[in-house]
């Protein structure tokens, strides 16, 4: 049922008995207020410097542009429009020019203080739009200017605050002083509170040994923090790589996507320990898987000790050539045979995976040298079936001694392995020539120059195997089988 409109009261001279009664009736239609009161009205005009507000007073109220918003240097047209209903606080009923001066932002400020004080009392969060970046933090519009220190924006300090402009942020009120017009906020406190339950649930589901994907969120001297999806875990510098590194930035950068293994979850301290290297193959296991005892491999002398020489055969893999395995003759000190930095072809004589040790021999590598090139000796492993027959590479036809069509990738891989084996053989040949020249020149001298120096690219560059070489290799292998 519709309610009939009630007409506004009309005042006429005939309605009242006297002029005094008439003035009293008019007086009742005029609003009265004092400085500091909050009044309501309708925007009737918007100029560049001020806004006119009809509040039912004898004159329209004036809101200067600076009193429209807590933002600085605003365009009135961006804040209000004609016809808007707004609240304003009376700054002065009559200035020197007889104008009623109002403030929209002060009315908003007074209303906001009551709301904020209530939220602070209940320990609840406040929402606001970031309107400024100032020295040391952000300014939020929460009905008044709330200050959010940079150190309290996130769980860790944020360097660039510009991306937060215009964003709505929820934060806890940690300091409130109306007399000083001071409101300090903390988004970190809000994050800690709201994420506590989420973190607990996440940590409860995170099991030791689990493999997770994450993003590197920050790097410190002792490791890298990885965001697993709301919870950060630490990859200690010792768990970043199998090889020795001086700083985490040698392995990862902020923003990198990584796969890590969960090493430990400390529920009490809410800390997660992670490992990047645990998701990668141990280089020692890789070496043991790809090398056999008896193979001759290239290396570089890295260190001399009284009992022998250490030779690096792969990144992160060093083996010992005992002094007794340096040469056939008696050697007093290792530098009679080799020097740090020398390239050397050595034979793998033992692999101890549990103790992460490999034993190498320069002497046996030279003893095993034959002028006929044998790829199997230099890392090109042979494969045989249960009957002892050699297994040829996929795509190679042993009957025609040719590669089949469609196996270009397999052929390229095989030929690359062949070329590498041939390169190692040439390095070994150069080493043998140097040893022979040294023995002939020294003829009994106890001092010998290093086993080898870095051969030229021309001397050591491997070449791809031709079909004729493949056929010859097939005949050799078939004969030895």
Swiss-Prot record:
Superkingdom as given in the UniProt entry: Bacteria
Keywords attached to this entry: Repeat, Ribonucleoprotein, Ribosomal protein, RNA-binding
Domain S1 motif: 36-105, 123-188, 209-277, 294-363
Function: Binds mRNA; thus facilitating recognition of the initiation point. It is needed to translate mRNA with a short Shine-Dalgarno (SD) purine-rich sequence.
BP terms from Gene Ontology: translation
Source organism phylogeny: Bacteria, Bacillati, Actinomycetota, Actinomycetes, Mycobacteriales
Family under the similarity heading: Belongs to the bacterial ribosomal protein bS1 family.
NCBIfam families: PRK06676.1 (NF005208), PRK07899.1 (NF005911)
The protein, known as: Small ribosomal subunit protein bS1
Single GO MF annotation: mRNA binding
Spans annotated as Disordered: 437-465
Any one Pfam family match given in the protein's UniProt record, by short name: S1
A Gene Ontology cellular-component term: ribonucleoprotein complex
Composition-biased stretches (Polar residues): 445-457
PANTHER family, alphabetized: 30S RIBOSOMAL PROTEIN S1 (PTHR10724), SMALL RIBOSOMAL SUBUNIT PROTEIN BS1C (PTHR10724:SF7)
PROSITE patterns: S1
KW Repeat (keyword) present: yes
């Amino acid at each position: 049922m519709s309610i009939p409109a009630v007409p506004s009261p009309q005042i006429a001279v005939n309605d009242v008995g006297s002029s005094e009664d008439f003035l009293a009736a008019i007086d009742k239609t005029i609003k009265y207020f004092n400085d500091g009161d909050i009044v309501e009205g309708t925007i009737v005009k918007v100029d560049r410097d001020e806004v006119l507000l009809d509040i039912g007073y004898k004159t329209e109220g004036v809101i200067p542009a600076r009193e429209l918003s807590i933002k600085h240097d605003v365009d009135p047209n961006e804040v209000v429009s004609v016809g808007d209903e707004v609240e304003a606080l009376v700054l002065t009923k009559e200035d020197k020019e007889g104008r009623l001066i109002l403030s929209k932002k002060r009315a908003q400020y007074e209303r906001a203080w009551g709301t904020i004080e209530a939220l602070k009392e209940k320990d609840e969060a406040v929402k606001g739009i970031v309107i400024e970046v100032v020295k040391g933090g952000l300014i939020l519009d929460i009905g008044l200017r709330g200050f959010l220190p940079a150190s309290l924006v996130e769980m860790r300090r944020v360097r660039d605050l510009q991306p937060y402009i215009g964003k709505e942020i929820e934060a806890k009120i940690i300091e409130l002083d109306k007399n000083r017009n001071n409101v300090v906020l903390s988004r970190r406190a809000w994050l800690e509170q709201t994420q506590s339950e989420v973190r607990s649930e996440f940590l409860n589901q995170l099991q030791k040994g689990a493999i997770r994907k994450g993003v590197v969120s920050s790097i410190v001297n002792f490791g890298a923090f990885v965001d697993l999806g709301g919870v950060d875990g630490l990859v200690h510098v010792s768990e970043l790589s199998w090889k020795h590194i001086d700083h985490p930035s040698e392995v990862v950068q902020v923003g990198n996507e990584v796969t890590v293994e969960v090493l430990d979850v400390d529920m009490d301290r809410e800390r997660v320990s992670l490992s990047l290297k645990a998701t990668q193959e141990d280089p020692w296991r890789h070496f043991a898987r790809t090398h056999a005892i008896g193979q001759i491999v290239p290396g570089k002398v890295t260190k001399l000790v009284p009992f022998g020489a250490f030779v690096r055969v792969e990144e992160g893999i060093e083996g010992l050539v005992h002094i007794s395995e340096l040469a056939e003759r008696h050697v007093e000190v290792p530098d009679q045979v080799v020097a740090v930095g020398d390239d050397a072809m050595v034979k793998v004589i033992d692999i101890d995976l549990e103790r992460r040790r490999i034993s190498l021999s320069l002497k046996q590598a030279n003893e095993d040298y034959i002028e006929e090139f044998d790829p199997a000796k230099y890392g090109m492993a042979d494969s045989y079936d249960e009957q002892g027959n050699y297994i040829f590479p996929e795509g190679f036809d042993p009957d025609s001694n040719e590669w089949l069509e469609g196996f270009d990738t397999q052929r390229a891989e095989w030929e690359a392995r062949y070329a590498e084996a041939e390169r190692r053989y040439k390095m070994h040949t150069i080493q043998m020539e140097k040893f022979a020249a040294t023995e002939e020149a020294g003829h009994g001298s106890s001092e010998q120059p290093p086993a080898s120096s870095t051969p030229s690219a021309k001397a050591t560059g491997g070449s791809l195997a031709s079909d004729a070489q493949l056929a010859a290799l097939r005949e050799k292998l078939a004969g030895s089988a």
